[in-house]
């Protein structure tokens, strides 16, 4: 039996960890240099254990959803 989300150790404990993973994912997917990506907003959903990071570069914007326990990107949505 595995522990609930509240009892599991989170790999993305801090906002800066979530931002780093989000920037890395965007940079790989869109072939953009990380220094050209700006952080617009971050949010942590404590119920689901997910981080949401809004990033912007050139004329594009995206929201990156990440699982804080597994430290993986679960969704990238352009806005």
Place the predicted regions along the sequence by residue.
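Exposed beta-strand-loop-beta-strand "reactive/processing" segments of non-cytosolic proteins
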Residues: 32-79
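Short, non-transmembrane alpha-helical segments in secretory-pathway proteins
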Residues: 3-38
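Short acidic DE-rich linear segments
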Residues: 1-5, 77-79
């Amino acid at each position: 039996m595995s522990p609930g989300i509240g009892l599991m150790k989170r790999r993305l404990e801090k906002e800066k960890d979530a931002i780093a993973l989000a920037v890395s994912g965007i940079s790989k997917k869109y072939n953009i240099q990380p220094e050209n990506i700006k952080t617009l907003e971050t949010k942590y959903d404590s119920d689901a254990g997910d981080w949401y990071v809004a990033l912007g570069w050139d004329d594009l914007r995206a929201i990156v959803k990440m699982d804080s326990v597994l430290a993986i990107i679960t969704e990238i949505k352009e806005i």
